[in-house]
Design a protein with these regions (language model features):
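Bacterial Sec-dependent N-terminal signal peptides
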Residues: 1-29
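Beta-propeller blade termini and top-face loops
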Residues: 26-850
Length: 854
């Protein structure tokens, strides 16, 4: 009988897995033809939109202005340069960064991987040629896909589309030094799906046509290239194997390597084979390369080596303390004999809840209530890419143009942490073969050919570096880009100043308070949580000072930091407009008061012996508007506090489809909302496609995703403020390279669903917002813009003719001022008055009434 039950259970699991895989297979990547056609339709419809003249104001911030992925500097006048932002477009300065102009913000792609400029002596910026490769290659959660290559011959006033639509992510554009019609492009390819359009592409007619000259396989593309300027037929290309899904990321593979061409990129040969001195095999990750142009025989390469790091040092072991490893395979008998004082110290050092001490744990293990492995299991994460026992960043040098390689760094370089896939760049001085710059979380410089490195990121800089230009005439002068924007040094990194005039913040979530004037709060990618006045003027978006009497009051910035890390969601208690709930990645939140130092850490944990909780990168939180003492928090379960996030209680079981094996936390709650009409009417959405409703404050939940597309990321659940049973959801296929716009509405608490917005372009949706005053008006933010419906979702129109093309991650309506606040992931915060929208709506509604009465 037991054997029969086991077979039945196994068969059931097999059927469920088959169903799951079949459903997943139905979520197919959107092909380029459909995508480009949709973009053209979008442009056409935007011209006729009733809302085409709606104006917006940008309020910043600028001091933390987003991820810069590439910089191109005029070698004849270094005060002029271009800065390419991951999702904020291309910007141009002629005054060393004091001010910038956006020159790539209305094209069919907003995200940039690399740029190249055909600089000419004595040329004006109106005559030079600029190339833009769209689609960031850093392969993070928000590395959006592009649509190919663009070119401008008039400094960005007009752009010509050059093709490569399935490239998605472009790592490098190399221009021939003397023939402006020849260029090479390193195409990394799709991030979330296999595809053939990867490798190296070459054009000999200025981009009118392309030839794929290096192709490896459907998961391996080219991420980096360099050229011998003395002999332009000699090129190098770095290939990189990487695959990603919503629950897993593999950033290494045996097809990662360096290729060389001796005939202008027409044919290629692998120069990092086994025996070359360069790492090979499944542990090789992202690679960067640099040619020393004064002597092109000298090459440098940086590699993310994921091979295990063997610790051969003779470190003195601290026997006065326990380590995590001590508990890995510990027996019951061994644990019960541990020193209580040392065990208590270990529990304190590792942030175990206060309710656990040595005596209580030993008693629970002795009674078999807990397993001996419970301590180790509680500490070690099942998910996440947290393997620090790898070699990581390594520097290699070749003195024979790639025939052989030698590792030159004598000590481990700790700049990659666990995410070397996010970096992979190396530079060599144009004049000094031994001066090498590379980076990861820090920017590092070597003066001895890569043997030793020194971190030189000082005050006024930001972490996570991605690009650097070295002045060919003065190699102590660098212009570098990182997750916080651009930094400039004139003394090899001893002192830096920060470029702070670009509103390119990458917001995840935003909210407002009810102060007068009201403030806007938001969490930014790798830039923490900030608050700024909704009345911030364009000239005061960054390090411009607030209007104060400077003789009697200290200077203040218009935007202020209220939290670090990757800023996520924010909630404000509008009873005082001072109590703030904010946090960072994977659910580490806090409650703080802006007027004092009162602070409460918020991060619910599982108990010893329980299955670990799972937290989304952007873990959702919610403050009830019915009673702002009530606070909700979503892991894979719902947690609630009745007293301002203190004493959080777990109310639900796992509301997702369950844990899925992989290196990325998955099976997590992504959205929480409460009905504005009924206290305790809650909805949640998950990253694996579940939508659940509770009508009793979170104690009991019902799955209500019948009839919806399966397994899609639920980006937003929004309960209606007009009808109690109405709820709206947006589903997002970005993590399948599917760009469909999915939005659904239910009138019966999710029992049945109806798809709306079927005329929306092929752009993944992030947020839907009801207009609180007019029931028929809906606002939707996508990965490419803002749309509005006047008929409860039957049809939508563009509302972003005066916005740049940029992902819109969040929308908030400040009801007192009747303003729509737009949180973008690349161009900071925009605000518009809704009075004009309402006026247009009423005009349309009155015309329809008149026509009906005739």
């Amino acid at each position: 009988m037991k054997y029969h039950n086991k077979l039945s259970f196994s068969f059931t699991i097999l059927l469920l897995n088959s169903f799951f895989l079949t459903t997943l297979a139905q979520i197919k990547p959107t092909n380029a033809k459909e995508r480009l056609s949709s973009l053209q339709k979008r442009k056409s419809e935007a011209k006729n939109s009733l809302l085409k003249n709606i104006a917006f104001r940008n309020i910043g911030p600028t001091q933390m202005n987003g991820r810069v992925v590439d910089i191109e500097v005029n070698p004849y006048d270094p005060t002029e340069f271009y800065a390419a932002y991951a999702s904020g477009g291309l910007w141009h300065t002629t005054n060393n960064g004091l001010s910038f102009d956006p020159i790539f913000e209305q094209e069919d792609a907003f995200t940039i991987g690399d740029i190249a400029v055909n600089w000419k002596p004595n040329s004006t910026n109106q005559s030079r040629i600029i190339w833009v490769g769209t689609g960031e290659v850093n392969s993070s959660r928000s590395s959006y896909s592009g649509t190919g290559v663009f070119k401008s011959v008039d400094n960005g006033k007009n752009w010509e589309y050059l093709g490569l639509p399935e490239s998605h992510h472009i790592g490098e554009i190399i221009l021939h030094p003397t023939n402006e019609n020849i260029a090479w492009v390193a195409v990394l390819g799709h991030l979330y799906s296999p595809n053939k359009e990867r490798g190296v592409y070459k054009t000999i007619n200025g981009g009118k046509s392309w030839t794929q000259t290096l192709a490896i396989d459907q998961n391996t593309g080219a991420v980096e290239m360099d050229i011998n300027l003395q002999n332009p037929d000699e090129l190098y290309a770095c290939t990189w194997y990487r695959t990603r899904s919503a629950w897993d990321f593999t950033p290494t593979g045996k097809t990662s390597g360096i290729y060389k061409s001796a005939d202008g990129g027409n044919h290629w040969q692998l120069i990092t084979e086994k025996g070359s001195g360069f790492p090979t095999g499944d542990s090789v990750g992202r690679i960067g390369i640099a040619v020393f142009q004064k002597n092109p025989q000298i090459l440098y390469a940086v590699v993310d080596n994921n091979s295990s790091l063997r610790d051969t040092s003779t470190k003195k072991i601290d026997t006065t303390k326990y380590t995590t490893a001590d508990f890995k395979n510990i027996s019951k008998e061994e644990l019960l004999t541990l020193n209580n004082a040392k065990l208590d110290s270990f529990l304190t050092d590792n942030d175990f809840p206060n309710k656990y001490n040595s005596k209580k744990i030993k008693a629970s293990i002795e009674s078999n209530e807990l397993k001996p492995s419970s301590i180790y299991d509680w500490l070690v994460a099942e998910d996440g890419f947290q393997n620090n026992g790898i070699k990581g960043c390594e520097i290699y040098r070749s003195d024979d143009a790639g025939k052989s390689w030698k590792k030159v760094n004598t000590k481990p370089i700790r700049v990659f942490s666990s995410y070397g896939y996010y970096f992979g760049k190396i530079y060599v001085s144009p004049t000094d073969e031994n001066k090498v710059i590379s980076f990861g979380t820090s920017i590092i410089v070597s003066k001895d050919g890569g043997k030793t490195f020194t971190a030189v990121d000082k005050d006024n800089t930001h972490g996570d570096w991605h690009s650097c230009w070295i002045n060919p005439n003065k190699d102590s002068h660098w212009i570098a880009g990182n997750d916080g924007g651009c930094n400039i040094t004139y003394d090899n990194g001893k002192k830096w100043f920060k470029v702070t005039s670009v509103p390119a913040g990458q917001f995840y979530g935003i909210t407002t308070d009810n102060a007068k004037p009201y403030n806007v709060y938001g969490g930014l990618q790798d830039n923490g949580t900030w608050v700024g006045s909704s009345q911030t003027a364009s000239e005061n978006m960054g390090f411009s000072f607030a209007k104060k009497n400077k003789e009697t009051e200290p200077e203040e910035f218009e935007w202020k930091s209220i939290g670090g890390g990757d800023g996520m969601q924010v909630q404000v208690d509008t009873r005082d407009n001072k109590t703030i709930y904010s946090g960072s990645q994977f659910g580490f939140y806090s409650r703080k008061n802006l007027d004092n130092d009162k602070y409460l850490s918020i991060h619910p944990m599982h108990d010893l012996g329980e299955t670990k909780l799972r937290y989304n990168w952007q873990t959702p939180i919610l403050l009830s508007r019915h009673n702002q003492d009530v606070f909700y928090y979503g892991s894979n379960k719902i947690h609630r506090s009745l007293n301002k996030a203190e004493n959080l209680q777990t109310l639900s079981d796992d509301l997702t489809k369950g844990k899925k094996t992989g290196t990325v936390p998955y099976g997590t709650i992504t959205s929480i909302c409460e009905s504005p009409l009924k206290f305790g009417l809650l909805y949640i959405g998950t990253d694996d496609g579940n939508i659940q409703v509770s009508k009793d404050g979170g104690y009991n939940w019902t799955l209500v995703n019948k009839g919806l597309p399966e397994n899609l990321w639920v980006s937003k659940v929004a309960a209606s403020s007009h009808k109690e049973g109405r709820v709206l959801v947006t589903l997002n296929g970005y993590r399948y390279d599917n760009f469909s716009a999915w939005i659904y509405m239910s009138e019966d608490y999710g029992t049945t669903w109806k798809q709306i917005g079927t005329d929306l372009p092929l752009e993944p949706l992030n947020v839907v917002k009801e207009d609180p005053l007019i029931e028929n008006i809906l606002y939707v933010g996508s990965d490419n813009g803002l749309y509005t419906s006047f008929d409860l979702g039957k049809s939508f129109m563009n509302m972003d003719n005066h916005l740049p093309r940029v992902p819109i991650h969040d929308l908030v309506i400040q009801q007192r001022e009747n303003e729509l606040v737009v949180g973008t992931h690349g161009r900071s915060i925009f605000i518009t008055k809704l009075d004009a929208v309402h006026k247009i709506y009423n005009s349309v509604a009155n015309k329809e009434k008149t026509n009906l009465s005739k």
